[in-house]
């Protein structure tokens, strides 16, 4: 049951997105919908609006490509200059309420695709489209959606659903191996679709038509997430392979998708993938075409993310900065050398915090409690206050004075004028921020919480 439940969710929840188009056709595509059955049961009414929308790498357009008002049993929508891609047909009720998805269709060959005819019905709280005329792939897509909706409603069982989907897949392969619907089937209905190697082999990234679809972007994201337990180096290689193998029109979209996926990665250190991909494929564009595609605001945010993170990634030498303590004495951190006895190693913890931050107020006592009971390799903690009020700093310093642990050396520092440039060098755009280095200043942990810090310290001390 698990496999078919997954497939039903995948197809029923087809996402909508904005559209630009790839190839022009000499003429228009007409979509003729016979809505008699849906009107008779009240699912569609006169005065309702039916619209066609398309995709640009999984994003739905805000404006319809074509729309019409229901006046009788049938409605004809004309898609001028129909292009290759994936489309959805939406219903907006005159009385208001949620916009509903009536059906989907593909245009795989824009030059020969001229007309689609469907009968629209409504049951099981879902619309059903029966293909009457048009491309063979859309007849199969209508069958697929009907089977999935029947399965979701419980009107057919797991065995019947499997037989239906397998039959549709076989007919798709026999009908037109180059159709967009066939690519969708390869990615979702093949018995090998849980194999990472198989999915990579059938991702149609060399096909420029898939830029204007939703299903390929979803497959790329699922593919990358299935590999997230790999090392950062391996993930960077995998990400670059995706971008490099793609058609030139797809490259910036795939690179942006990878950047967005890894910039806030749950697994520590994987933000390095976002930095590397952005530097190579989004910011290294002398023509300015990528900046124009992304828009200035998005382009600037990517550039800022890279600049704020590229100096303090895991495995790097932590940037050297000088900060004063409460007596005005400058401390150069991180210290790069061995322990105080000339042989023993130590760890160095950077903790950037302030007083008017609710997260800091929650984190500081947890960190102090952790360091109080810590036993292991000696730690130097640099408690770096990012505020500008000396009195508030002194008050915050008192919270760390409770740490009475011979394994922990605390140094309170601040930089009210930001002369050290620590926000840029250490990516401190918000507080609290924690970063751990070795006694040589090599970064071994970043974006830490008290819990993840404790887990990292346990792992280091076990080794």
Question: Which stretches of residues belong to each language-model region?
Answer:
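Bacterial Sec-dependent N-terminal signal peptides
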Residues: 1-33
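A non-transmembrane, solvent-exposed segment enriched in polar/low-complexity residues
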Residues: 25-202
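N-terminal, charged low-complexity regulatory/assembly segments
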Residues: 162-245, 261
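N-proximal helix/coil linker or "cap" segments that precede and/or mark the start of modular domains
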Residues: 270-326, 335-345, 372, 391, ...
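Short active-site neighborhood of thiol/selenol oxidoreductases, capturing the structured segment around
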Residues: 333-367
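Structural microenvironment flanking redox-active thiols in thiol-disulfide oxidoreductases
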Residues: 361-402, 418-422
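Short, internal strand/loop/helix patches
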Residues: 397-435, 439
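Non-catalytic, surface beta->alpha helical segment in thiol-disulfide oxidoreductase systems
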Residues: 430-431, 440-463
């Amino acid at each position: 049951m698990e496999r078919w439940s997954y497939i039903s969710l995948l197809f029923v929840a087809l996402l909508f997105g904005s559209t630009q188009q790839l190839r022009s056709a000499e003429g228009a595509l007409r979509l003729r919908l016979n809505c008699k059955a849906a009107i008779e049961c009240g699912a569609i009414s006169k005065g309702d609006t039916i619209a066609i929308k398309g995709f640009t790498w999984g994003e739905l357009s805000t404006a319809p490509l074509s729309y019409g008002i229901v006046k009788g049993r049938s409605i004809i929508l004309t898609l001028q200059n129909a292009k290759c891609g994936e489309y959805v047909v939406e219903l907006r009720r005159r009385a208001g309420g949620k916009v509903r998805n009536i059906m989907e269709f593909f245009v795989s060959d824009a030059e020969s695709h001229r007309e689609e005819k469907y009968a629209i019905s409504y049951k099981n709280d879902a619309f059903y489209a029966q293909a009457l005329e048009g491309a063979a792939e859309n007849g199969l897509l209508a069958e697929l959606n009907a089977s999935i909706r029947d399965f979701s409603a419980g009107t057919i069982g797991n065995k019947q659903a499997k037989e239906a989907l397998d039959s549709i897949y076989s007919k798709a392969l026999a009908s037109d191996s180059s159709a967009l619907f066939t690519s969708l089937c390869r990615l979702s209905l093949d018995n090998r679709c849980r194999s990472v190697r198989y999915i990579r082999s059938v991702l149609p990234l060399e096909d420029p038509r898939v830029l204007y679809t939703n299903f390929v972007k979803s497959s790329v994201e699922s593919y990358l997430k299935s590999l997230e337990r790999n090392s950062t180096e391996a993930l960077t290689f995998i990400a670059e392979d995706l971008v490099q193998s793609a058609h030139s029109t797809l490259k910036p979209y795939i690179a942006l998708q990878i950047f967005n996926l890894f910039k806030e990665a749950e697994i520590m250190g994987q933000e390095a993938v976002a930095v590397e991909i952005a530097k190579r494929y989004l910011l290294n564009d002398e023509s300015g075409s990528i900046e124009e595609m992304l828009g200035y605001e998005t382009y600037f945010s990517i550039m800022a993310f890279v600049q704020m993170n590229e100096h303090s990634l895991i495995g790097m030498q932590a940037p050297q900065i000088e900060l004063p303590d409460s007596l005005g004495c400058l401390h150069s951190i991180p210290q790069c050398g061995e322990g105080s006895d000339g042989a023993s190693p130590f760890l160095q913890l950077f903790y950037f915090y302030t007083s008017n931050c609710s997260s800091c107020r929650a984190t500081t006592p947890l960190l102090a409690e952790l360091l109080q009971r810590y036993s292991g390799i000696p730690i130097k903690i640099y408690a770096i206050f990012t505020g500008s009020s000396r009195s508030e700093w002194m008050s915050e310093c008192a919270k760390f004075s409770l740490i009475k642990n011979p394994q922990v050396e605390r140094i309170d520092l601040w930089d009210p004028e930001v002369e050290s440039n620590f926000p840029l060098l250490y990516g401190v755009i918000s507080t609290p921020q924690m970063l751990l280095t070795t006694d040589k200043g090599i970064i071994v942990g970043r974006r830490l919480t008290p819990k993840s810090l404790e887990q990292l310290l346990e792992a280091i001390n076990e080794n």
